[in-house]
Amino acid sequence: MDYTVIEVPDMNDSVSRISLQGSQYQLRFTWNDTGGYWMFGILNSLGEPLLIGVKVVPQFPLNLFHSAKNMPQGIFAALTEKESVGRRDFADGKAQFAFISA
């Protein structure tokens, strides 16, 4: 399986620029301290939301039910052996955020 690992900044809220399949996107990662989980969103190059507020759960295609022509064709997933992704798990290497191209 060929996939791209996407670095999740060690911040409670961040927006990163990324190029996927020849197009520019922005990914937003937000830590929900009250609930104890990560959320992510996809924005186009202008910062317009394509998908927002998706709870990051391990080993599940996070955008399975959210597909559009203007989004990257593939799935986003959190790869880990853990049952949930904690605040420091991406930074500590216990989890990876990945894009698997279709």
Segments predicted by a language model, with ranges:
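Short beta-strand/loop motifs in extracellular/secreted proteins, especially
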Residues: S14-S16, W38, A95
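Short, surface-exposed beta-strand/turn "edge" patches of beta-sheet domains
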Residues: L79-R88
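Non-cytosolic beta-sheet module surface loops
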Residues: L20, T30-D33
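Compositionally biased, intrinsically disordered low-complexity segments enriched in polar/Pro/Gly
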Residues: M1, P72, I100-A102
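Short, charged/polar N-terminal "headpieces" of proteins
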Residues: M1-Q26
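C-terminal charged interaction modules
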Residues: R87-A102
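Acidic, aromatic-enriched beta-alpha/helix-loop junctions
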Residues: D33-L79
